[in-house]
Amino acid sequence: MKFMIGLMSAAIVGLAGAMPAHAETLRVGMECTYAPFNYRTPEGEMAGYDVDVAKGIAERIGVDLEYVCQEWDGMLPALLASKFDLIVASMSITEERKQKIDFSIPYRVSLGRILGAKDAGLKLFDDAGKPNPEAFNGLRFGVERASTYAKWVEAKLPGAEIVLYDGAQPMLLDLQNGRIDIAITNPMKAYLDFLSKENGAGFEFVSPPIDEVEYFGPGVGVGLRKGNDELLAKIDKALEDMIKDGSLEKYSSKYFPFSIQPSGWKGVGE
């Protein structure tokens, strides 16, 4: 299988028109900076769990791939403007997003956790796992812009002092350097890129896993424009096959020392 890798910014793609379900090449939108999910290696190659999933889908439905790098807050508008055909970028399946685009079945879990300093003595949640809004008073709270985490914080902690970031990396750097007190992000990425490293030694998760379906949805899926039902069915079938044959677990084991697969899968085993 030949994979066409076009590492271009979404701003210069400039392609219009809907991609038919039988297309020989599918353009895949992703950030290209979100390791270990989707990123460029020093050699300029695309790598990460999302990339492996996209390749697995392409192999099973018989298409080539072209990668289009796109900043997160412009991901949905770029898809709707036909700058690419699929989003394979760790995007959570939420009701708000489903009003605009379609999603495949999930290919990994979607949740967040809050990080803070070990010596801060933070008790932000009660014994039932619910946040105590008053405990967040006076804390500078790092949140990624236009994310499901931002939606959750705005709804649950309306009085929080939010500091917005364009990605997890600058946010965690500010946490390390004391410019913010706590931060919420993907716990898989936080563990691999921060907590397991020397610079994250003084920090820990200060919340339980936060996975309320209302905000985080049932998991992460492939996004595509509405009206591509044939392509969506092919992608769902490819993902079901990858679940059944263990491919998704194999992909995730390359990057994570723990499972990132949902406990149940729509359509599998029915």
Model segments located where?
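Extracytoplasmic small-molecule ligand-binding "clamshell" domains
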Residues: 23-91, 99, 245, 258
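Short helix-initiation/N-cap motifs at beta->coil->alpha
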Residues: 51-52, 67-77, 128-129, 162-177
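Extended ligand-binding regions for polar small-molecule ligands
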Residues: 52-60, 119-127, 139-140, 147, ...
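Alpha-to-beta junction loops
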Residues: 62-64, 81-89, 139, 158, ...
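A conserved helix-loop-strand patch within extracytoplasmic ligand-binding domains
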Residues: 63, 92, 99-154
